[in-house]
Amino acid sequence: MSGEGENPASKPTPVQDVQGDGRWMSLHHRFVADSKDKEPEVVFIGDSLVQLMHQCEIWRELFSPLHALNFGIGGDSTQHVLWRLENGELEHIRPKIVVVWVGTNNHSHTAEQVTGGIKAIVQLVNKLQPQARVVVLGLLPRGQHPNPLREKNRQVNELVRAALAGYPRAHFLDADPGFVHSDGTISHHDMYDYLHLSRLGYTPVCRALHSLLLRLLAQDQGQGIPLPETAP
């Protein structure tokens, strides 16, 4: 990517197998194999927030009817998603929409670097799947109380929203329905460990996303109202 230099967040990199059980690579190979006989309308790719969504009833209610595939892996950062995309996870399918939700695990990277990583993912999806739209979900606030990572995620969202204005088939969706209370805290009812969503927390996120997906699919079928380049 021009202008990113040696940005580690935009350099495709596999996860280092520090535990020695090969699970990450096994999941990657399974995703590639599972996609060979599928015809999904929507593909989700990202970290644990994507992965755990698949276990909720709302996934079966909203996204299974779209023949959605879930390529979420816990702990993934932008550079790991880039590597997976470069190594076959979109090779055998032609989805209409690719949903990307990743970046909160890029702990050691600046907001600008994380934004560069997300932009690199969008560009790669555009290259590999030019017919597909890309929906980037905004990073959620994290931590029970205000903290630097929460602020960095907010900065990433601002930067990504602005950056995607230059991509006509990319859309940004602020996935936060208001998880931060007026006193600055996040409830464990919404995020059970103040990072991962509970079933209650997933509900408003998934319903807002589902509404956008239906609008985009209808628009591409000539039935919808034209959308701006980024969704509010």
Swiss-Prot record:
The keyword Hydrolase applies. The modification Phosphoserine is found at residue 2. Belongs to the 'GDSL' lipolytic enzyme family. Platelet-activating factor acetylhydrolase IB beta/gamma subunits subfamily. GO terms for molecular function: 1-alkyl-2-acetylglycerophosphocholine esterase activity; identical protein binding; platelet-activating factor acetyltransferase activity; protein heterodimerization activity; protein homodimerization activity; protein-containing complex binding. Originally the subunits of the type I platelet-activating factor (PAF) acetylhydrolase was named alpha (PAFAH1B1), beta (PAFAH1B2) and gamma (PAFAH1B3). Now these subunits have been renamed beta (PAFAH1B1), alpha2 (PAFAH1B2) and alpha1 (PAFAH1B3) respectively. Alpha1 catalytic subunit of the cytosolic type I platelet-activating factor (PAF) acetylhydrolase (PAF-AH (I)) heterotetrameric enzyme that catalyzes the hydrolyze of the acetyl group at the sn-2 position of PAF and its analogs and modulates the action of PAF. The activity and substrate specificity of PAF-AH (I) are affected by its subunit composition. It is found in: Cytoplasm. The lineage of its organism: Eukaryota, Metazoa, Chordata, Craniata, Vertebrata. InterPro entries: SGNH_hydro, SGNH_hydro_sf. Residues 1-20 are annotated as: Disordered. GO terms for biological process: lipid catabolic process; spermatogenesis. Keywords: Acetylation, Cytoplasm, Hydrolase, Lipid degradation, Lipid metabolism, Phosphoprotein. It comes from Rattus norvegicus (Rat). Beta subunit (PAFAH1B1) inhibits the acetylhydrolase activity of the alpha1/alpha1 catalytic homodimer. It catalyses: a 1-O-alkyl-2-acetyl-sn-glycero-3-phosphocholine + H2O = a 1-O-alkyl-sn-glycero-3-phosphocholine + acetate + H(+); 1-O-hexadecyl-2-acetyl-sn-glycero-3-phosphocholine + H2O = 1-O-hexadecyl-sn-glycero-3-phosphocholine + acetate + H(+); 1-O-hexadecyl-2-acetyl-sn-glycero-3-phosphate + H2O = 1-O-hexadecyl-sn-glycero-3-phosphate + acetate + H(+). Pfam families: Lipase_GDSL_2 (PF13472). Expressed in brain, spleen, lung, liver, kidney and testis. Not expressed in heart and skeletal muscle. Expressed in fetal brain as heterodimer. Not expressed in adult tissues. Expressed exclusively in granule cells. The active site is at 48, 193, 196. The modification N-acetylserine is found at residue 2. This is Platelet-activating factor acetylhydrolase IB subunit alpha1. Gene3D superfamilies: SGNH hydrolase.
